[in-house]
Amino acid sequence: MYNLRMAESVTEGHPDKIADQLADALLDEFIKKDPYSKVSLEIMVTTGLVMVGGELTTESYVDIPRVVRSVIKDIGYTRPELGFDADTCAVVQSIDEQSPEIALGISSEGAGDTAIVVGYATKEAPNLMPWPITIAHKITKRISEYRKIGKFPFLRPDGKVLVAMIYEDGKPSYVQSIVAYVHHDPDVSINHLRELIIEEIIKKEIPEEFLTEKTSIKVNPTGRFVIGGPVADTGLTGRKIVSDAYGDIGLSGGSAFSGKDPTKTDRSGSYLARMIAKHVVAGGWAERCLVQIGYAFGLTEPVAFDIETFGTEKISKEILEDAVKKVFPLRPAEIIEFLDLRKPIYRQTSVYGHFGKENLPWEKLTKLEELKELLD
């Protein structure tokens, strides 16, 4: 029996990802100066304009236009011909103080928002992530890297990759297709571009066992991609939530991450859920694990908790859930302290996925021995 799984990744110059990076870069700046800042920011980017909106309570001052221009420059929008330029874009702000009713709920160490959060892990890839999203992120990250270091100087910042993979009996078999859309200068030959992207990036980022004669690879199948970035599409925070997470394999709780401080449980709770799922798979108690937690605004305890292992479990669900609840902190305030989330770590999460990066605290297997004492 076989089925198809897919995942999408975008480069850091994609309009929606520009917005996510700006939101998290600003969050980092506020947290750096005031770790207890309450931040909920939304960003819109379009031709020649960045709009920053949201709610904020903090003791710190951040020069928002300066941060915005610095991030846009770092991404690579530094030429007027791109239609969006770090030096000339307008930066408009409309930021209010956080609602006192929301502040009251958080001050009692309750959840800063009502949220369904999910975390997923699978033994497929070395980082215990699904292969489709892992491959997609590897390709887009390499495209951006080669642009920035000047190896492919004709590349522009925007881009997108879609990966479709065939699974047989629940296990990854081969990559069925990859479609890449790569933003480029007008004077590069489309055939030369396609050859370089396919041979120097895509084929080198797919594990050999997944690359077969059945694999279809297409680059810019519609032709030229010269007009890109915010001049071509308006970008908004929170529009790449499946790409931010696990692709189409792991469920999504529906909430976005970027621009939110850790009192927002749709962010911090999702990080803990991933950590739990990763521990379950790393410990050998299941081959796949989906953790779902429900939080309600102002309440200090989760209102729902579930672990799904898709028939791959080596131990009963009841025993597993009981051990997890004993080992991991599930209260919002405890999650923040446990994962040390009042530090400026968020911009790095805003591109190429929030999960699977081994340097992030929720990817560490720090509770594995405690779980083994209860389960082995």
From Swiss-Prot:
Gene3D superfamilies: 3.30.300.10. It is found in: Cytoplasm. ATP binds at residues 14, 158-160, 224-225, 233, 239-240, 256, 260. L-methionine binds at residues 55, 98, 233, 264. Pathway: Amino-acid biosynthesis; S-adenosyl-L-methionine biosynthesis; S-adenosyl-L-methionine from L-methionine: step 1/1. SUPFAM superfamilies: S-adenosylmethionine synthetase. GO terms for biological process: one-carbon metabolic process; S-adenosylmethionine biosynthetic process. Coiled coil: none annotated. One of its GO terms (cellular component) is cytosol. K(+) binds at residue 42. Pfam families: S-AdoMet_synt_C, S-AdoMet_synt_M, S-AdoMet_synt_N. GO terms for molecular function: ATP binding; magnesium ion binding; methionine adenosyltransferase activity. Mg(2+) binds at residue 16. InterPro entries: S-AdoMet_synt_C, S-AdoMet_synt_central, S-AdoMet_synt_N, S-AdoMet_synthetase, S-AdoMet_synthetase_sfam. Residues 98-108 are annotated as: Flexible loop. It catalyses: L-methionine + ATP + H2O = S-adenosyl-L-methionine + phosphate + diphosphate. Transmembrane segments: none annotated. Keywords: ATP-binding, Cytoplasm, Magnesium, Metal-binding, Nucleotide-binding, One-carbon metabolism, Potassium, Transferase. Its EC number is 2.5.1.6. Its main location: cytoplasm. Homotetramer; dimer of dimers. Belongs to the AdoMet synthase family. NCBIfam families: metK (TIGR01034). This is S-adenosylmethionine synthase.
